[in-house]
Protein backbone atom coordinates (compact mmCIF):
# COMPACT_ATOMS: atom_id res chain seq x y z
CA UNK A 1 0.00 0.00 0.00
CA UNK A 2 1.37 3.39 -1.04
CA UNK A 3 0.60 6.25 1.36
CA UNK A 4 1.07 9.89 0.41
CA UNK A 5 0.98 12.40 3.27
CA UNK A 6 0.92 16.19 3.54
CA UNK A 7 2.35 18.15 6.49
CA UNK A 8 1.47 21.85 6.84
CA UNK A 9 1.08 22.54 10.55
CA UNK A 10 3.58 25.41 10.77
CA UNK A 11 6.21 26.79 8.38
CA UNK A 12 7.31 23.65 6.53
CA UNK A 13 5.39 22.28 3.56
CA UNK A 14 6.08 18.56 3.54
CA UNK A 15 5.01 15.74 1.23
CA UNK A 16 6.08 12.24 2.16
CA UNK A 17 5.41 8.93 0.46
CA UNK A 18 5.80 5.58 2.20
CA UNK A 19 4.94 1.98 1.46
CA UNK A 20 3.16 -0.20 4.01
CA UNK A 21 4.17 -3.81 3.45
CA UNK A 22 2.04 -6.88 4.03
CA UNK A 23 4.26 -7.66 7.03
CA UNK A 24 3.59 -4.26 8.60
CA UNK A 25 6.93 -2.79 7.56
CA UNK A 26 7.02 0.86 6.52
CA UNK A 27 9.48 1.97 3.83
CA UNK A 28 10.22 5.59 2.94
CA UNK A 29 9.93 6.34 -0.78
CA UNK A 30 10.05 10.15 -0.83
CA UNK A 31 10.44 13.03 1.61
CA UNK A 32 10.21 16.49 0.08
CA UNK A 33 10.10 19.66 2.22
CA UNK A 34 9.83 23.36 1.35
CA UNK A 35 10.44 25.77 4.22
CA UNK A 36 9.27 29.37 4.59
CA UNK A 37 11.50 29.98 7.62
CA UNK A 38 13.49 32.72 5.86
CA UNK A 39 10.29 34.68 5.27
CA UNK A 40 9.58 34.68 9.01
CA UNK A 41 13.10 35.46 10.24
CA UNK A 42 12.80 39.24 9.98
CA UNK A 43 9.72 39.14 12.20
CA UNK A 44 11.45 37.09 14.90
CA UNK A 45 8.92 34.25 14.71
CA UNK A 46 6.34 32.52 12.56
CA UNK A 47 3.69 34.80 11.06
CA UNK A 48 0.57 32.65 10.48
CA UNK A 49 -0.63 34.46 7.34
CA UNK A 50 2.79 34.24 5.72
CA UNK A 51 2.95 30.54 6.57
CA UNK A 52 -0.45 29.89 4.98
CA UNK A 53 0.44 31.75 1.78
CA UNK A 54 3.77 29.93 1.58
CA UNK A 55 1.99 26.56 1.81
CA UNK A 56 -0.31 27.56 -1.07
CA UNK A 57 2.69 28.42 -3.24
CA UNK A 58 4.88 25.46 -2.29
CA UNK A 59 2.44 22.57 -2.11
CA UNK A 60 2.09 21.90 -5.84
CA UNK A 61 5.82 21.84 -6.66
CA UNK A 62 6.58 19.84 -3.50
CA UNK A 63 3.90 17.29 -4.43
CA UNK A 64 5.30 16.89 -7.94
CA UNK A 65 8.84 16.37 -6.62
CA UNK A 66 7.68 13.73 -4.15
CA UNK A 67 5.70 11.77 -6.75
CA UNK A 68 8.65 11.89 -9.15
CA UNK A 69 11.13 10.80 -6.48
CA UNK A 70 8.94 7.87 -5.44
CA UNK A 71 8.09 6.93 -9.02
CA UNK A 72 4.41 6.94 -8.12
CA UNK A 73 1.52 8.13 -10.29
CA UNK A 74 -1.28 7.51 -7.81
CA UNK A 75 -1.12 6.47 -4.13
CA UNK A 76 -3.52 4.07 -2.44
CA UNK A 77 -4.13 6.44 0.48
CA UNK A 78 -3.79 10.18 1.13
CA UNK A 79 -3.10 11.39 4.68
CA UNK A 80 -2.64 14.84 6.18
CA UNK A 81 -1.80 16.51 9.46
CA UNK A 82 -5.17 17.54 10.91
CA UNK A 83 -3.68 19.16 14.05
CA UNK A 84 -2.27 20.55 16.22
CA UNK A 85 -0.80 23.60 14.53
CA UNK A 86 -1.60 26.97 13.00
CA UNK A 87 -5.25 27.12 11.90
CA UNK A 88 -4.66 28.65 8.47
CA UNK A 89 -1.64 26.51 7.71
CA UNK A 90 -3.51 23.34 8.62
CA UNK A 91 -6.44 24.31 6.40
CA UNK A 92 -4.20 24.56 3.34
CA UNK A 93 -2.74 21.08 3.76
CA UNK A 94 -5.99 19.40 4.78
CA UNK A 95 -7.97 20.95 1.93
CA UNK A 96 -5.33 19.87 -0.57
CA UNK A 97 -5.20 16.33 0.82
CA UNK A 98 -8.98 15.99 0.61
CA UNK A 99 -8.94 17.26 -2.97
CA UNK A 100 -6.23 14.80 -3.98
CA UNK A 101 -8.04 11.93 -2.24
CA UNK A 102 -11.29 12.78 -4.01
CA UNK A 103 -9.61 13.17 -7.40
CA UNK A 104 -7.71 9.90 -7.06
CA UNK A 105 -10.74 8.21 -5.43
CA UNK A 106 -8.68 6.87 -2.54
CA UNK A 107 -9.25 6.91 1.26
CA UNK A 108 -8.30 9.95 3.33
CA UNK A 109 -6.70 9.76 6.79
CA UNK A 110 -6.58 12.80 9.09
CA UNK A 111 -3.79 12.18 11.59
CA UNK A 112 -2.05 13.83 14.53
CA UNK A 113 1.11 15.84 13.86
CA UNK A 114 2.61 14.85 17.22
CA UNK A 115 2.11 11.15 16.59
CA UNK A 116 3.92 11.71 13.33
CA UNK A 117 7.02 12.93 15.15
CA UNK A 118 7.11 9.66 17.09
CA UNK A 119 6.57 7.58 13.96
CA UNK A 120 9.42 9.24 12.04
CA UNK A 121 11.95 7.15 13.97
CA UNK A 122 10.75 3.95 12.30
CA UNK A 123 12.52 4.95 9.09
CA UNK A 124 15.88 4.94 10.89
CA UNK A 125 15.53 2.19 13.48
CA UNK A 126 12.73 -0.14 12.40
CA UNK A 127 9.60 -1.19 14.33
CA UNK A 128 9.12 0.69 17.59
CA UNK A 129 8.82 -1.41 20.76
CA UNK A 130 7.01 -0.18 23.86
CA UNK A 131 8.70 3.11 24.68
CA UNK A 132 8.75 6.23 26.76
CA UNK A 133 8.39 9.07 24.29
CA UNK A 134 9.96 12.46 24.97
CA UNK A 135 8.41 14.80 22.43
CA UNK A 136 10.10 18.21 22.36
CA UNK A 137 9.47 20.93 19.80
CA UNK A 138 8.83 24.63 19.43
CA UNK A 139 5.27 24.37 20.64
CA UNK A 140 5.15 21.13 22.60
CA UNK A 141 6.92 19.29 25.40
CA UNK A 142 5.32 15.97 26.35
CA UNK A 143 6.36 12.84 28.20
CA UNK A 144 4.46 9.88 26.77
CA UNK A 145 3.94 6.16 27.19
CA UNK A 146 3.87 4.61 23.72
CA UNK A 147 2.78 0.98 23.81
CA UNK A 148 2.80 0.86 20.01
CA UNK A 149 2.24 3.38 17.24
CA UNK A 150 -1.10 1.79 16.41
CA UNK A 151 -2.50 2.15 19.94
CA UNK A 152 -3.67 5.25 21.81
CA UNK A 153 -0.76 7.21 23.27
CA UNK A 154 -0.79 7.85 27.02
CA UNK A 155 0.34 11.27 28.21
CA UNK A 156 2.36 11.13 31.43
CA UNK A 157 3.11 14.84 31.65
CA UNK A 158 3.70 18.03 29.69
CA UNK A 159 4.94 21.56 30.15
CA UNK A 160 2.89 23.83 32.39
CA UNK A 161 4.09 26.94 30.54
CA UNK A 162 6.68 27.33 27.77
CA UNK A 163 7.69 24.47 25.52
CA UNK A 164 11.39 23.63 25.42
CA UNK A 165 11.75 24.82 21.83
CA UNK A 166 9.95 28.06 22.63
CA UNK A 167 12.44 28.71 25.44
CA UNK A 168 15.30 28.10 23.00
CA UNK A 169 13.94 30.65 20.55
CA UNK A 170 13.36 33.25 23.27
CA UNK A 171 16.86 32.90 24.72
CA UNK A 172 18.35 33.02 21.23
CA UNK A 173 16.56 36.32 20.61
CA UNK A 174 17.75 37.59 23.99
CA UNK A 175 21.33 36.85 22.94
CA UNK A 176 20.82 38.46 19.54
CA UNK A 177 21.14 35.20 17.64
CA UNK A 178 18.07 35.71 15.46
CA UNK A 179 15.26 33.34 14.50
CA UNK A 180 15.04 30.42 14.45
CA UNK A 181 17.56 30.25 17.24
CA UNK A 182 17.76 26.62 18.27
CA UNK A 183 20.54 25.51 15.94
CA UNK A 184 22.59 28.70 16.34
CA UNK A 185 22.29 28.58 20.14
CA UNK A 186 23.36 24.92 20.09
CA UNK A 187 26.47 25.82 18.10
CA UNK A 188 27.28 28.72 20.44
CA UNK A 189 26.79 26.54 23.53
CA UNK A 190 29.41 24.07 22.30
CA UNK A 191 31.96 26.88 22.60
CA UNK A 192 31.01 27.62 26.23
CA UNK A 193 31.40 26.00 29.65
CA UNK A 194 28.12 24.43 30.85
CA UNK A 195 29.39 24.58 34.44
CA UNK A 196 30.31 28.27 34.38
CA UNK A 197 26.74 29.41 35.10
CA UNK A 198 24.18 27.26 36.87
CA UNK A 199 20.60 28.05 35.98
CA UNK A 200 17.53 26.68 37.82
CA UNK A 201 15.87 23.40 36.89
CA UNK A 202 12.10 23.88 36.94
CA UNK A 203 9.63 21.32 38.33
CA UNK A 204 12.34 19.23 40.00
CA UNK A 205 11.37 19.71 43.65
CA UNK A 206 10.15 16.82 45.82
CA UNK A 207 6.56 18.11 45.71
CA UNK A 208 6.49 18.85 41.98
CA UNK A 209 4.75 16.62 39.46
CA UNK A 210 7.42 14.08 38.48
CA UNK A 211 6.62 14.11 34.76
CA UNK A 212 5.71 17.79 34.29
CA UNK A 213 7.99 20.47 32.88
CA UNK A 214 8.40 24.22 33.31
CA UNK A 215 10.75 26.49 31.39
CA UNK A 216 9.38 29.97 32.09
CA UNK A 217 11.42 30.32 35.29
CA UNK A 218 14.57 29.26 33.48
CA UNK A 219 13.88 31.77 30.73
CA UNK A 220 13.42 34.55 33.30
CA UNK A 221 16.57 33.53 35.20
CA UNK A 222 18.67 33.69 32.03
CA UNK A 223 17.23 37.10 31.11
CA UNK A 224 17.98 38.50 34.57
CA UNK A 225 21.50 37.08 34.52
CA UNK A 226 22.26 38.63 31.15
CA UNK A 227 20.87 41.97 32.31
CA UNK A 228 22.96 41.98 35.51
CA UNK A 229 26.11 40.52 33.94
CA UNK A 230 26.56 42.33 30.62
CA UNK A 231 30.18 41.23 30.51
CA UNK A 232 29.29 37.52 30.70
CA UNK A 233 30.35 35.19 27.91
CA UNK A 234 27.43 34.54 25.59
CA UNK A 235 28.79 31.06 24.96
CA UNK A 236 28.76 30.29 28.69
CA UNK A 237 25.21 31.63 29.03
CA UNK A 238 24.09 29.49 26.11
CA UNK A 239 25.87 26.43 27.50
CA UNK A 240 24.40 26.90 30.97
CA UNK A 241 20.90 27.33 29.58
CA UNK A 242 21.22 24.34 27.27
CA UNK A 243 22.56 22.17 30.09
CA UNK A 244 19.58 23.05 32.29
CA UNK A 245 17.09 22.12 29.57
CA UNK A 246 18.81 18.86 28.62
CA UNK A 247 19.27 17.90 32.28
CA UNK A 248 15.58 18.22 33.14
CA UNK A 249 14.31 16.59 29.95
CA UNK A 250 16.54 13.54 30.14
CA UNK A 251 16.27 13.06 33.91
CA UNK A 252 12.48 12.98 33.84
CA UNK A 253 12.36 10.75 30.76
CA UNK A 254 14.74 8.17 32.23
CA UNK A 255 12.87 8.29 35.53
CA UNK A 256 9.56 7.62 33.77
CA UNK A 257 11.04 4.65 31.96
CA UNK A 258 12.28 3.21 35.24
CA UNK A 259 8.96 3.83 36.99
CA UNK A 260 6.99 2.08 34.24
CA UNK A 261 9.51 -0.68 33.59
CA UNK A 262 10.06 0.38 29.96
CA UNK A 263 13.49 -0.20 28.45
CA UNK A 264 13.37 2.08 25.38
CA UNK A 265 13.42 5.88 25.27
CA UNK A 266 12.36 7.62 22.06
CA UNK A 267 13.14 11.34 21.70
CA UNK A 268 11.36 13.13 18.87
CA UNK A 269 10.47 16.62 17.66
CA UNK A 270 12.56 19.54 16.49
CA UNK A 271 14.51 19.92 19.74
CA UNK A 272 15.59 16.27 19.43
CA UNK A 273 18.15 17.52 16.90
CA UNK A 274 19.97 19.36 19.72
CA UNK A 275 23.47 17.99 20.23
CA UNK A 276 23.60 18.25 24.03
CA UNK A 277 20.18 16.65 24.47
CA UNK A 278 21.26 13.72 22.30
CA UNK A 279 24.59 13.40 24.11
CA UNK A 280 23.18 13.52 27.65
CA UNK A 281 20.31 11.18 26.76
CA UNK A 282 22.81 8.66 25.41
CA UNK A 283 24.88 8.84 28.60
CA UNK A 284 21.90 8.42 30.91
CA UNK A 285 20.30 5.66 28.87
CA UNK A 286 23.57 3.73 28.83
CA UNK A 287 23.90 4.12 32.60
CA UNK A 288 20.32 2.89 33.06
CA UNK A 289 20.71 -0.04 30.66
CA UNK A 290 18.14 1.43 28.28
CA UNK A 291 17.93 1.65 24.50
CA UNK A 292 17.85 5.19 23.08
CA UNK A 293 16.20 5.97 19.77
CA UNK A 294 16.40 9.40 18.12
CA UNK A 295 15.70 10.02 14.42
CA UNK A 296 18.29 11.66 12.22
CA UNK A 297 18.07 15.48 12.50
CA UNK A 298 16.23 15.87 9.18
CA UNK A 299 13.42 13.64 10.46
CA UNK A 300 13.23 15.52 13.78
CA UNK A 301 11.88 18.66 12.14
CA UNK A 302 8.46 18.83 10.44
CA UNK A 303 8.11 16.71 7.30
CA UNK A 304 5.56 14.71 5.35
CA UNK A 305 7.41 11.41 5.78
CA UNK A 306 6.55 11.24 9.47
CA UNK A 307 2.85 11.74 8.70
CA UNK A 308 2.97 8.94 6.13
CA UNK A 309 4.62 6.69 8.72
CA UNK A 310 2.05 7.42 11.41
CA UNK A 311 -0.83 6.93 8.97
CA UNK A 312 0.70 3.60 7.93
CA UNK A 313 0.81 2.38 11.52
CA UNK A 314 -2.79 3.45 12.16
CA UNK A 315 -3.92 1.67 8.99
CA UNK A 316 -1.98 -1.47 9.94
CA UNK A 317 -3.76 -1.42 13.30
CA UNK A 318 -7.14 -1.37 11.57
CA UNK A 319 -8.05 2.33 11.64
CA UNK A 320 -10.90 3.32 9.34
CA UNK A 321 -10.55 6.23 6.91
CA UNK A 322 -11.51 9.73 8.02
CA UNK A 323 -14.54 11.43 6.48
CA UNK A 324 -13.88 14.12 3.91
CA UNK A 325 -15.65 16.60 6.16
CA UNK A 326 -13.17 16.02 9.02
CA UNK A 327 -12.20 19.45 10.35
CA UNK A 328 -8.68 20.54 11.20
CA UNK A 329 -8.08 21.04 14.92
CA UNK A 330 -5.32 23.50 15.93
CA UNK A 331 -5.51 22.23 19.52
CA UNK A 332 -5.70 18.50 18.83
CA UNK A 333 -4.39 16.64 21.91
CA UNK A 334 -1.49 14.24 21.57
CA UNK A 335 -3.61 11.35 22.84
CA UNK A 336 -5.93 11.55 19.80
CA UNK A 337 -4.07 9.90 16.95
CA UNK A 338 -6.68 10.40 14.26
CA UNK A 339 -9.80 12.44 13.49
CA UNK A 340 -12.25 9.80 12.28
Curated annotation (Swiss-Prot):
One of its GO terms (biological process) is tRNA threonylcarbamoyladenosine modification. Keywords: Acyltransferase, Cytoplasm, Iron, Metal-binding, Transferase, tRNA processing. It comes from the Bacteria. Binds 1 Fe(2+) ion per subunit. NCBIfam families: gcp_kae1 (TIGR00329), T6A_TsaD_YgjD (TIGR03723). GO terms for molecular function: iron ion binding; N(6)-L-threonylcarbamoyladenine synthase activity. GO terms for cellular component: cytoplasm. Substrate binds at residues 135-139, 169, 182, 186, 274. Its EC number is 2.3.1.234. Its main location: cytoplasm. It catalyses: L-threonylcarbamoyladenylate + adenosine(37) in tRNA = N(6)-L-threonylcarbamoyladenosine(37) in tRNA + AMP + H(+). The gene is tsaD. The keyword tRNA processing applies. Fe cation binds at residues 113, 117, 302. It is an enzyme of class 2 (transferase). It holds the Pfam family TsaD. PANTHER family: TRNA N6-ADENOSINE THREONYLCARBAMOYLTRANSFERASE, TRNA N6-ADENOSINE THREONYLCARBAMOYLTRANSFERASE, MITOCHONDRIAL. Gene3D superfamilies: 3.30.420.40. Belongs to the KAE1 / TsaD family. InterPro entries: ATPase_NBD, Gcp-like_dom, KAE1/TsaD, Peptidase_M22_CS, TsaD. This is tRNA N6-adenosine threonylcarbamoyltransferase. The keyword Cytoplasm applies. Its cofactor is Fe(2+). Required for the formation of a threonylcarbamoyl group on adenosine at position 37 (t(6)A37) in tRNAs that read codons beginning with adenine. Is involved in the transfer of the threonylcarbamoyl moiety of threonylcarbamoyl-AMP (TC-AMP) to the N6 group of A37, together with TsaE and TsaB. TsaD likely plays a direct catalytic role in this reaction. It comes from Mycolicibacterium gilvum (strain PYR-GCK) (Mycobacterium gilvum (strain PYR-GCK)).
